[in-house]
Amino acid sequence: MPWVGSQFHKGDAQTIMALSNVLYQVLIALGMIYVIDTSAIISRNLNLLEGDLMFPSSVIGEIKKGKLRYMIDVLLPMIRVASPDHEYLKIVEETAAKTGDLMNLSQTDKDVLALALQYDATIVTDDYSIQNVASYLNLGFLNANIKRIDKQIAWIYRCTGCKKVFPGPVKVCDICGHEVKRHYDKRKSMIRKV
């Protein structure tokens, strides 16, 4: 495809638009669903056109102008734009809270995870927090451009002074007043490869 890993040319848009309806039907027929994160679009390495591609409508809001916006406008006829059901968002938020990733996920990130959960889809992302939560939800994920995570990670929040552990993100310790930081929890993290 002319846009995979390369720059867009305005002439390519007409060709893509002409083939979009037929191509979209072929992608759906193959039965593979991919939910694309903003980082996958930014990487410009979308070579996964062997299935049904979708992303949450919030991705469009994250990419407002320039070549990437043009790329989204060209790809829109071939990509389903959807919003996840509330029940799936709730599952994602509960899981992300348990892993300690909730504060690192934007609403778009949560939407990506919830759509993948709702449609039993594979996520395409370079975001490590999304990959980590996806692994806990037993969702498949592919990296777009950078190395993917190779194990599940659980995070804890610990005071830098008195070492008190907090159940969730806190900026300042209520005991000693020191800063609370997120740390990798070796005891809760899974050894299994993802």
From Swiss-Prot:
Signal peptide: none annotated. CDD domains: PIN_Nob1-like (cd09876). SUPFAM superfamilies: PIN domain-like (SSF88723). One of its GO terms (biological process) is maturation of SSU-rRNA. Its cofactor is Mg(2+). Keywords: Hydrolase, Magnesium, Metal-binding, Nuclease, Toxin-antitoxin system. The keyword Magnesium applies. One of its GO terms (molecular function) is magnesium ion binding. Mg(2+) binds at D37, D150. GO terms for cellular component: preribosome, small subunit precursor. Its EC number is 3.1.-.-. Residues 34-134 form the PINc domain. Toxic component of a type II toxin-antitoxin (TA) system. An RNase. Belongs to the PINc/VapC protein family. This is Ribonuclease VapC1. It comes from Thermoplasma acidophilum (strain ATCC 25905 / DSM 1728 / JCM 9062 / NBRC 15155 / AMRC-C165). The gene is vapC1.
